[in-house]
Amino acid sequence: MRIESSIVNQIDELASDLNKTRSGLISIFITGGIEELVKQLQQRELPANDITTVDDDESNIRYFLLNTNYNNTPSDHFLMLKNGEAAAFYPGWKENIERLREGDIIFLYHSGHGICGYGSAGSKLNITDHQGDKNERYSRVLNNFVSNFKPITAKTCKDITKSNFNFRITMSRLTKEQGDAIVKKIKELMTA
């Protein structure tokens, strides 16, 4: 990574004043910057996180990409894979699990790795506690859950769907064409 010399000088002065190393401060700045950007993205997501649309036809299967929250809580990610379920936590996100219909196809996305499992939403909404917070975990079993394939990276997803979608938000709606392309790729990986 190249950093302008004027910025390096400022970092060195701060490092000296704070009795820290240059690389330590750079790491702090990067971490703080990432945290701030994540907060900004979450604020952008909140008003538009309703996964339903006005023209939804009750008879059509819908497709969704669910970020498993690995970067925040790895245990949530592993629990979803172990139990073959889709889950979300806390107001603003958990309601998306409630809005799923039986038969909707859910792809589980592991940040930095890719789509690592999928199945069709079951009919029963399960509401449980999350990390001591009452009723803050909404989940649904994913019927016919499959996870025994090499994860499909974000780049591969974009390539096979010929589209760009946001992997960072908790849950996003995919088009039928995007969903079909991902299912096709998973089936190819399982027979390879």
Where are these predicted regions, by residue range?
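Short alpha-helix capping/helix-loop boundary micro-motifs
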Residues: 88-96
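Short, basic/aromatic beta-hairpin or loop at an interaction surface
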Residues: 72-87
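Short, well-ordered loop/turn sites that connect or cap secondary structure elements
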Residues: 99-101
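Contiguous surface segments at macromolecular interaction interfaces
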Residues: 2-10, 16, 20-63, 91, ...
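Short beta-strand-centered aromatic/proline hotspots
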Residues: 115-126
